[in-house]
Design a protein with these regions (language model features):
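Single conserved hydrophobic/aromatic residue that forms the stacking wall/gate
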Residues: 1-7, 11
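Carbohydrate-associated surface elements
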Residues: 21
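A short helix/loop element that forms part of the nucleotide-sugar donor recognition site in Leloir-type
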Residues: 27-42, 46
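A conserved nucleotide-sugar
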Residues: 41-46, 53, 59-104, 187-188
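Aromatic "clamp/platform" in nucleotide-sugar-dependent glycosyltransferases that forms part
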Residues: 107, 126
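Short hydrophobic beta-strand element within catalytic cores of glycosyltransferases
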Residues: 143-147
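Conserved acidic donor-binding segment of nucleotide-sugar-dependent glycosyltransferases
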Residues: 159-171, 180-185
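A short, well-ordered alpha-helix in the C-terminal region of glycosyltransferases
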Residues: 173, 180, 187-201, 210-213
Length: 219
């Protein structure tokens, strides 16, 4: 080839995207195991976040957004995880009198029964690789609001056609997205169905077939 750019174009045309595999059936199976009820009021909006308490996961942005909507929306939010910023999050909750609507739960080995109970999953990360937790939430048919962080959420949520995206760190925009979901559940259900229909591309069976194709190609 006469140039590196030409070579690059050839490589792009021949490239195959293989995702970190999701075992959809295993998520469903684990979600059916017995677990205590974490959401006690059926009438409240049920919100869940799962992740380490670090700068990367940025749960503080989520807390700030929830603080903005607390007067307008009745909700119960559960944040599951552990990490060095746990005390900072608890301090913010106490300072803003959010104890009645936000609970922090320590890391659990099997979070899927808890994920199954929620209505809305929120990812507030500043950056990710491919956030498997979003795929797991979709496996259990949960609507997602996610930061538009690098990388993964935009692709998983079909550029906003399969869920709602907000700017990284923008808690005011996140608050608006939560309010939009609460007031437009029928529209959001259509977005969710769109994502669910496209989740097969992340399934381990689909990606194993791609691996087998590559192996056979070079044997």
């Amino acid at each position: 080839l006469s140039s590196s750019s030409a070579a690059s174009d050839v490589y792009k045309r021949q490239a195959i995207c293989i995702y970190n595999p999701l075992n959809h059936d295993e998520v469903i199976k684990k979600s059916k195991k017995n677990s205590k009820k974490i959401f006690t009021n059926k009438k409240q909006l049920k919100i869940l976040n799962i992740g380490r308490f670090t700068e990367q996961k940025d749960q503080l942005t989520l807390l700030k957004a929830l603080n903005l909507i607390k007067k307008d929306i009745s909700f119960q939010a559960i944040i599951i995880g552990r990490g060095k910023l746990r005390n900072d999050l608890i301090e913010y909750i106490n300072k803003n009198k959010l104890n009645d609507c936000i609970k922090i739960i320590d890391f659990v080995e099997n979070p899927f029964p808890l994920l199954k109970q929620t209505e809305l999953f929120i990812l507030s990360s500043r950056y990710e690789g491919l956030p498997n937790v979003l795929l797991e939430a979709l496996s259990l048919k949960k609507f997602i609001i996610s930061s538009n962080c690098p990388t993964g959420p935009k692709e998983i949520l079909l550029n906003g056609n399969g869920g709602l995206l907000f700017k990284v760190g923008d808690y005011k925009q996140l608050a608006k997205k939560i309010s939009y979901y609460q007031n437009n559940k029928n529209k959001c259900k259509k977005l969710l169905n769109h994502s669910i229909q496209n989740i097969k591309r992340f399934d381990y069976k689909t990606n194993m077939q791609k691996y087998l194709f590559l192996i056979k190609k070079f044997i």
